[in-house]
């Protein structure tokens, strides 16, 4: 999420 490369189910930045 949020500018990192983690897979999180949010409407943040690049997953």
Curated annotation (Swiss-Prot):
Domain of life: Eukaryota
Record carries keyword Secreted: yes
Glycoprotein in keyword set: yes
Processing after translation: Glycosylated.
An annotated GO cellular component: extracellular region
Places the protein is found: Secreted
Primary localisation category: secreted
Keywords: Glycoprotein, Secreted
Function: Rathke gland secretions may function as pheromones, as predator repellents, or contribute to the maintenance of the turtle shell.
Protein name in UniProt: Rathke gland glycoprotein
